[in-house]
């Protein structure tokens, strides 16, 4: 009721109140006269005969009830009249209050709609200012006239007119010059610290040229604006070429709970203005007109662009070279070339993307409370991020990991290796365990490690023990396989086969070529010389020493095959001409080569384990058992620590103890086998080259033999190709002799042929 009485009342409301008060005074008198009339009528009928008995016993008792009833009726009527008048007055007051409030709201909504219209172009604005006047809801607010060359501005104050009820009063002001006009503008800008609103020259609902003119002083200002700007009055002000100094910062005011979105950014082109935004609520419209956001930061200040507005690209690291002016260079003609690249494509491929860049429209939509709370990092941020990535790639939860550590279940080796790589140091573990804040604020990696270490204090030592168990069986199996390969390779090299025959041919040919020198009459040679045979060329350069030796061995094996074929039948030599003898020799040579090539060409297949042994790492073989023994001891220490943790770790300790007992037995047997095989390798190497083991890899012998066999296979392929070529040509000419030194007739002794299939019994 008090709030209702504080509102301004219509001018006719006092008259209405006076009428109701008159009615209140009139109704009680009328009711009193009506209540007395029945009593007066009863007293105007006297009778002389019956008067004494009527007055004493009959008339005196009814007088008291009539008087009391008349008093009560009068009180009831008075009370009813007062209640009726009060209720009527209250209803009338509420009704006129609502009517007055609706009228004010209609006027206010009309004023707000005028401030939300699109801006008027400069030319149209000037034309409308000269030719017409401004209306607000049909009421004239101001006139601009031209009287004898002077700009005359008529306006009226709406609130003054509402109080004085003078609708047609105007005030005249003549502006004599530019200086006076500037003073007027400057004085008005001091009074109003907000943007100056220009009222449209036509009605708000039908006008298409509405604009809001902002003061130049506030275009560069970054402070907040006053909370209220009167939109009922207007001022049409000419733009000042020299803006006045900025006013002092206004007092900050409390912003509304739901701030309206900022106005759309202005475009640089001169195209048509964008359509107006949809109408907002009353509070949003008033708050948007009262406060304005500062202009957005320039585009060049973003992290993805340089200061001159160009997109920042990835750098190309090179060393700049200054061109030499003394002579011409290839770079002199490059600047004058016609080549050009696609700059947009280059920016799309190599340009940095601006992180966190926001448009001005969505800068104020988000509230500070919606931002996610900052996470707490105990580890290094980069290590924490890498740890979180590894944990997500595991495909298992923290509870599953804790259960596996408690029960001693088997993990996949890859999972254990990933967990071992992210194991924190002792200092980091202690820092994580000492954290006493809210664990929900921890980062993902820190939260995972915190709960894991709280459940299992020696979690990562257990992971190392489980990793040892997962890797043990593949390692011990590979170690035993390598030992077996070395044993078989030594057995292949101990046999006196075709390989020894090749060594004999090389030794004899080498002594023949080194005759008369210090290198002649050699009894043995270092096997590394086998890899140098292809470097010794013939005089004509058509063949090598390796080709010669292999071809001779092939021919020798072919002759042996022919002799074995003729042992069971008689052979008679018939006389023939020299021409026929030559033809038969040529055919015999081809026959020897055809029969001997398969024998020599299949030599590498007899040394399969030798080629496998060449790929074995001696250091790995020698260190495997030592490494397994050391890791088994570490696992024992982990079990000693886990026994005192809790009762849940008993199952883990039991399983690991059983595993470690079997490991110790297997490693002991592997050490004995390793010692025996390495001793065999040493004796085999000394058999081929005495004293070559000292200071070198004991398995280097297998590498030399593997490479030499590969060279022999290649030569056999060349011999087969040449033989096929000569057979296709059908030439009967004598083959040109290879110009090597003449070998003695007993180059390939019968003893060597007879011993080619045997074995070395002295080894």
Curated annotation (Swiss-Prot):
Residues 303-738 form the FH2 domain. Residues 240-280 have a biased composition (Pro residues). Its main location: membrane. It comes from the Eukaryota. One of its GO terms (biological process) is actin nucleation. Residues 52-73, 185-327, 726-763 are annotated as: Disordered. It is found in: Cell membrane. The lineage of its organism: Eukaryota, Viridiplantae, Streptophyta, Embryophyta, Tracheophyta. GO terms for cellular component: cytoskeleton; plasma membrane. The chain crosses the membrane at residues 80-100. Residues 281-292 have a biased composition (Low complexity). It is a single-pass membrane protein. Residues 229-238, 316-327 have a biased composition (Basic and acidic residues). Expressed in the whole plant (at protein level). Interacts with profilin. Belongs to the formin-like family. Class-I subfamily. It holds the Pfam family FH2. Residues 205-225, 726-736 have a biased composition (Polar residues). SUPFAM superfamilies: Formin homology 2 domain (FH2 domain). Keywords: Cell membrane, Membrane, Signal, Transmembrane, Transmembrane helix. It comes from Arabidopsis thaliana. Might be involved in the organization and polarity of the actin cytoskeleton. The gene is FH4. One of its GO terms (molecular function) is actin filament binding. Residues 1-33 form the signal peptide. PROSITE patterns: FH2 (PS51444). This is Formin-like protein 4.
């Amino acid at each position: 009721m008090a709030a209702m009485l504080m509102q301004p009342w219509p001018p006719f409301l006092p008259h209405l109140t006076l009428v109701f008060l008159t009615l209140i005074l009139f109704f009680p008198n009328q009711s009193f006269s009506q209540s007395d009339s029945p009593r007066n009528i009863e007293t105007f009928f006297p009778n002389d005969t019956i008067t004494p008995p009527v007055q004493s016993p009959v008339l005196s008792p009814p007088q008291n009830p009539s008087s009391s009833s008349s008093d009560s009726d009068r009180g009831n009527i008075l009370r009813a009249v007062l209640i009726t008048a009060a209720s009527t007055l209250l209803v009338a007051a509420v009704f006129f209050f609502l009517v007055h409030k609706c009228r004010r709201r209609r006027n206010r909504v009309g004023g707000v709609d005028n401030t939300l219209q699109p801006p008027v172009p400069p030319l149209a604005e000037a034309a409308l200012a000269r030719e017409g006047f401004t209306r607000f809801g049909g009421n004239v607010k101001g006139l601009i006239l031209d009287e004898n060359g002077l700009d005359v501005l008529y306006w009226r104050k709406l609130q003054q007119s509402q109080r004085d009820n003078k609708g047609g009063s105007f005030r005249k002001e003549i502006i004599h010059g530019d200086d006076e006009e500037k003073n007027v503008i400057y004085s008005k800008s001091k009074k109003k610290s907000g943007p100056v609103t220009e009222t449209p020259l036509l009605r708000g609902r039908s006008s298409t040229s509405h604009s809001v003119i902002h003061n130049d002083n506030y275009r560069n200002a970054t402070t907040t604006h006053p909370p209220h700007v009167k939109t009922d009055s207007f001022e049409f002000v000419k733009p000042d070429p020299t803006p006045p100094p900025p006013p002092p910062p206004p007092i900050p005011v409390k912003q509304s709970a739901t701030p309206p979105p900022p106005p759309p950014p202005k475009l640089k082109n001169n195209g048509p203005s964008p359509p107006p935004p949809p109408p907002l609520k009353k509070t949003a419209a008033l708050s948007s007109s009262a406060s304005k956001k500062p202009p957005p930061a320039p585009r060049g200040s973003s992290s993805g662009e340089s200061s001159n507005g160009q997109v920042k690209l990835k750098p190309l690291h090179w060393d700049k070279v200054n061109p030499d002016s003394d002579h011409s260079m290839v770079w002199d003609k490059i600047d004058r070339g016609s080549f050009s690249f696609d700059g947009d494509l280059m920016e799309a491929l190599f340009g940095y993307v601006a992180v966190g860049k926001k448009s001005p429209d969505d800068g104020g939509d988000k509230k500070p409370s919606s931002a996610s709370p900052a996470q707490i990092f105990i580890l290094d941020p980069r290590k924490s991020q890498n740890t979180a990535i590894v944990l997500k790639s595991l495909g298992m939860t923290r509870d599953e990991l804790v259960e596996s550590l408690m029960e001693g279940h088997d993990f996949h080796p890859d999972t254990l290796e990933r967990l071992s790589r992210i194991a924190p140091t002792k200092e980091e573990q202690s820092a994580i365990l000492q954290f006493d804040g809210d664990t929900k604020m921890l980062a993902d990696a820190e939260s995972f490690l915190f709960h894991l270490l709280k459940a299992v204090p020696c979690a990562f030592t257990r992971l190392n023990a489980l990793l040892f168990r997962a890797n043990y069986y593949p390692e011990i199996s590979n170690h035993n396989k390598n030992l077996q390969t070395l044993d078989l390779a030594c057995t292949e090299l101990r046999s006196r086969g075709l390989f020894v025959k090749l060594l004999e041919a090389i030794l004899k040919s080498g002594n023949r070529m080194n005759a008369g020198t210090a290198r002649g009459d050699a009894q043995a040679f270092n096997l590394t010389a086998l890899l140098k045979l292809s470097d010794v060329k013939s005089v004509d350069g058509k063949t090598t020493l390796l080709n010669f030796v292999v071809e001779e061995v092939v021919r020798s094996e072919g002759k042996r095959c022919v002799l074995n074929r003729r042992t069971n039948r008689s052979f008679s030599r018939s006389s023939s001409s020299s021409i026929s003898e030559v033809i038969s020799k040529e055919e015999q040579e081809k026959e020897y080569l055809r029969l001997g090539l398969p024998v020599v060409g299949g030599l590498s297949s007899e040394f399969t384990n030798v080629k496998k042994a060449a790929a074995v790492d001696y250091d790995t073989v020698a260190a495997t058992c030592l490494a397994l023994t050391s890791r088994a001891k570490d696992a024992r220490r982990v079990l000693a620590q886990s026994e005192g943790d809790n009762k849940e770790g008993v199952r883990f300790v039991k399983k690991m103890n059983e595993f470690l007992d079997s490991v110790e037995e297997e490693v002991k047997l592997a050490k004995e086998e390793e010692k025996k095989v390495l001793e065999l390798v040493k004796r085999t190497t000394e058999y081929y080259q005495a004293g070559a083991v000292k200071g070198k890899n004991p398995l280097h012998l297998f590498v030399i033999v593997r490479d030499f066999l590969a060279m022999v296979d290649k030569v056999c392929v060349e011999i087969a190709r040449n033989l096929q070529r000569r057979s296709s040509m059908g030439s009967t000419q004598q083959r040109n002799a290879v110009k090597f030194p003449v070998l003695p007739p007993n180059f390939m002794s019968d003893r060597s042929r007879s011993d080619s299939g045997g074995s070395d019994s002295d080894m």
